[in-house]
Amino acid sequence: MAYQVTTFYHFTRLNCLAEKQSRWQELGDRLGLKGTILLAEEGVNATIAGESAAIEEMVKIMAADLGLTSVPQRHSWAKTIPFQRMKVKIKPEIVSLGQPQVNPEKQVGTYVSPQQWNQLLQDPDVVVIDTRNDYEVAIGTFQGAVNPCTKKFRQFPDYVKNNLDQQKNKKVAMFCTGGIRCEKASAYLLEEGFAEVYHLRGGILHYLETIAPEESLWQGECFVFDERVAVQEGLKVGSHALCDHCGYPLRVGDLAEIRYAVRHCPQCGLTVAVSNEL
C-alpha cells in the first residue's frame, strides 16, 4: 500500500492559535494521520501523510478554519508513512527568517511556473539563488544556481546584505523545496529595495512533478524533511539516508543485494550503518 504525502502552506493573519492547534491535533490523530503542522500569526505550514481520503478531509477542514475554499497542495507517495506521529506546533514564524517587518501576505515576488523556470535559468542577466540550507544544496540543485552556504534560513538576510546589496537592479530568481522559503525571501528582497524578484511556484517539488526528465535542468535529488530524506524526478523516493550521528544526508548507492553498508560520513567522519530499504 502506498501512502499519500501532502504539503501546503498559506500566509495569512491568524488568531486563536491554541484553539486551532488543539482542534487540528485531535482531528489528525482521529484520522490516523502523521506529520508536522506549524502555526503562527503569519499563517500555516503543513506536511501530513496517511490515506488519501483522510488527508482530503483534514485539508478541507483546515482550509475552512482558515477561511478558504481550498489551498494549493503538493502530493507525493511513500511505501510507509514517513513520520512517527502527528505534531501541531505554535511557532513565532512558519518559516524562520527573523525579519518581523517582512509580510508575504502584503507583497511577494513574481511567481514563475516550472515551464517558465528553465528560461530564467538560461538567462545570463538573472541571478539564480538557492534559498535552502547548505546540506540540502549538497545533494541537488539547479544548473548555475548560487549556493549562499547558509546553515539555516535566518542567515539569508546576512547573505543578501554581504553579497547582493550592490545588485538591486538585477533580476533575482529564487527557489526552495516547496515554495515557502523563496516566497518569504522574495518579500524580504522587495522590502530591501530589489527591483525585479522572481520565485519558483510550488518550489522544486512542483518542478520535479511537472517537468519531464529530458527537459529538466535539475541536478541530483531534493532533500525533504521526513524519513524519505530525498526525492527525485516524478517525486519518487531518492537514494539518500541520514547519518545516525550528525544528520547529514548520505548517498546510499546501488546496493541491490546488501541490506546494510558501512559508510563514513563526510561531514562528521564517524562510521554509520546506512539502510538500503528506501
From Swiss-Prot:
Disulfide cysteine pairs (residue numbers): none
Catalytic function, reaction form: uridine(34) in tRNA + AH2 + O2 = 5-hydroxyuridine(34) in tRNA + A + H2O
Residue ranges annotated for the Rhodanese domain, each copy included: 122-216
GO molecular function, one term: oxidoreductase activity, acting on paired donors, with incorporation or reduction of molecular oxygen
Keywords in alphabetical order: Oxidoreductase, tRNA processing
E.C. no: 1.14.-.-
Keyword Oxidoreductase included in the entry's annotation: yes
PROSITE patterns: RHODANESE_3
UniProt xrefs under Gene3D superfamilies: 3.30.70.100, Rhodanese-like domain (3.40.250.10)
Keyword flag Oxidoreductase: yes
Residues forming the catalytic site: 176
Family: Belongs to the TrhO family.
Name recorded for this polypeptide: tRNA uridine(34) hydroxylase
Source organism: Synechocystis sp. (strain ATCC 27184 / PCC 6803 / Kazusa)
